[in-house]
C-alpha cells in the first residue's frame, strides 16, 4: 500500500488530532476530505475504526478491522481492534478465537496477551486468564498493571485472587 501524501496525510493527521481532542464530528469531516482512492488506506480505516468505537458501532468496527486486515495483515492493531469489537459486541469467544492465532506472530505486543487474559476471564477460564496476564506483564509490567487495575473484564480473575491481581507476579 502506498503511503498517504499531502494533502491526504494532513487530513488524516488533523482527524487524529480531533479524535484526541474528543471532537468526532470534526474528525469525520477531515476523513471525508481524503481523496476517494485513499479512503481504503489502512491508516484512514484505523481512524474510522476509532470513530466507530467511540460511537459503540461494534459491527461496523469489525467490518473496518477486517478491511484493514485484508490490506495489511502484519498490522497488530487491526487484529486487536477486530477482537475488541467482537468482544464489545458480546461475541467474546469469537474475539478470543480470532486473536489467539496471532499471539505468537506479534510476541512484543503486550495488548494481545492482555486482551486474551480479559477474554478468558469473561469466559470463566481463570487459570488461562492468569497465564495470559502473566505473559502481558513480562512484556510491559507498568503499563499492564495500570490497564488492569480497574478493568471490568478482569473482575472475575481479580475476585478469584481475593480482590488483587498482583499476587500473579509474586
Residue ranges and their predicted role:
Residues 1, 143-170:
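Terminal, low-structured helical/coil segments at or just beyond the last alpha-helical repeat
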Residues 4-54:
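Alpha-helical segment of the N-proximal tetratricopeptide repeat
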Residues 5, 39, 73, 106-107, ...:
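Short coil turns that delineate tetratricopeptide repeat
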Residues 20-21, 54, 88, 122, ...:
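Register position in tetratricopeptide repeats
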Residues 42-43, 76-77, 110-113, 139-150:
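Boundary/linker segments of alpha-helical solenoid repeat arrays
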Residues 43-111:
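Alpha-helical adaptor scaffolds
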Residues 121-122, 126-144, 170:
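TPR/TPR-like (Sel1-like) alpha-helical repeat modules
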Amino acid at each position: 500500500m502506498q503511503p498517504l501524501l499531502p494533502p491526504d496525510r494532513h487530513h488524516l493527521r488533523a482527524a487524529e488530532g480531533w479524535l484526541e481532542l474528543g471532537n468526532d464530528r470534526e474528525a469525520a469531516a477531515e476523513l471525508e476530505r481524503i481523496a476517494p482512492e485513499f479512503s481504503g488506506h489502512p491508516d484512514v480505516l484505523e481512524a474510522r475504526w476509532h470513530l466507530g468505537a467511540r460511537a459503540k458501532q461494534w459491527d461496523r468496527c469489525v467490518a473496518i478491522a477486517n478491511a484493514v486486515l485484508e490490506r495489511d495483515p502484519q498490522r497488530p492493531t487491526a487484529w486487536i481492534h477486530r477482537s475488541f469489537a467482537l468482544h464489545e459486541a458480546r461475541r467474546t469467544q469469537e474475539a478470543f478465537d480470532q486473536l489467539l492465532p496471532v499471539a505468537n506472530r506479534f510476541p512484543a505486543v503486550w495488548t494481545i496477551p492482555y486482551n486474551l487474559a480479559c477474554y478468558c476471564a469473561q469466559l470463566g477460564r481463570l487459570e488461562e486468564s492468569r497465564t495470559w496476564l502473566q505473559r502481558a506483564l513480562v512484556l510491559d509490567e507498568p503499563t499492564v498493571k495500570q490497564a488492569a487495575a480497574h478493568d471490568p473484564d478482569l473482575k472475575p480473575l481479580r475476585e478469584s485472587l481475593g480482590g488483587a491481581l498482583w499476587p500473579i507476579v509474586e
